[in-house]
Every structure is written in structure tokens, then in C-alpha cells.
Amino acid sequence: DPFSLDVWDPFKDFPFTNSALSASSFPQENSAFVSTRIDWKETPEAHVFKADLPGLKKEEVKVEIEDDRVLQISGERNVEKEDKNDQWHRVERSSGKFMRRFRLPENAKMDQVKAAMENGVLTVTVPKEEIKKPEVKSIEISS
């Protein structure tokens, strides 16, 4: 396949005697932890997080808020059950646990966080406190 991309493994052919140095002990590019990308944007009303989680059901994803204003998004992609007669030619889809944590700013309304999942995209909305403009009162100057 001319459009396929195989990542070169510089350690593949080295006869390491210490298993701690083997290539399999290094983090893999396709691990779920690495591939869980999350966007964070701030609108005038809220902080909005979007995560692409293809193939996951909402029951497989956890959204949690910790006391110190930390938003945690975690879950697990399960490995496909393997039949002994199956021969795999390529495994590119990631599996395993993932977790991402974000410290929210002071203006986050921690008690009003909402999460929704649609078509494999998780959206977490954290409303912001309204910035109160100082009330200015004119004082009349007497003579």
C-alpha cells in the first residue's frame, strides 16, 4: 500500500539483554493516552472542552471535578476480543485507559458543569462567573 505509513523503530533489530531497554518498554505512538486530543476554548460565557472519543459510549467516559478546580476526563477503550484463528496484519486503533486533567481558572462555576456526548465527541461546558462592573455613583459637589 503506497499510502501506508510505518513508523521506523530504531531499536527493532538490536539484541538488548536488559529487557528494561527493549523497544517495547517505550511508550507507543498509538496508545490511547497519547491520542486523546482535547480542545479548550474560552467564550464570553464559558470554558468549553471538546474531546474526540470515537467508538466510546458515554458510559465508558468519566467527567469529574475535584475540589481544587481540576477537571478530569477519563475512560477506557477496550481491546477487541481476539480469536486464536485470527491473523492481524495491522493494529492502528488505540486501546487502553486515558486520562486528561485541566486546572480551571478562578472564574469557573464548578457547580454548573455540563457534559454531553454526540457522535463520539464529548463536550464539557464550564460556565464562567459574570464579571461585575463596579457601580459608579456620581457625587454632587456642594459649594
From Swiss-Prot:
Name by which UniProt lists this protein:
18.1 kDa class I heat shock protein
GO cellular component terms?
Answer: cytoplasm
The subcellular location is: Cytoplasm
Q: Does the keyword Amino-acid biosynthesis apply?
A: no
Q: Which family is this protein grouped under? A: Belongs to the small heat shock protein (HSP20) family.
Keyword annotations for this protein?
A: Cytoplasm, Stress response
What induces this one? By stress.
Q: Which residues form the sHSP domain?
A: 29-143
Whether Oxidoreductase counts among this entry's keywords is: no
Tell me the subunit arrangement.
Answer: Forms oligomeric structures.
Q: Which CDD domains match?
A: ACD_ScHsp26_like
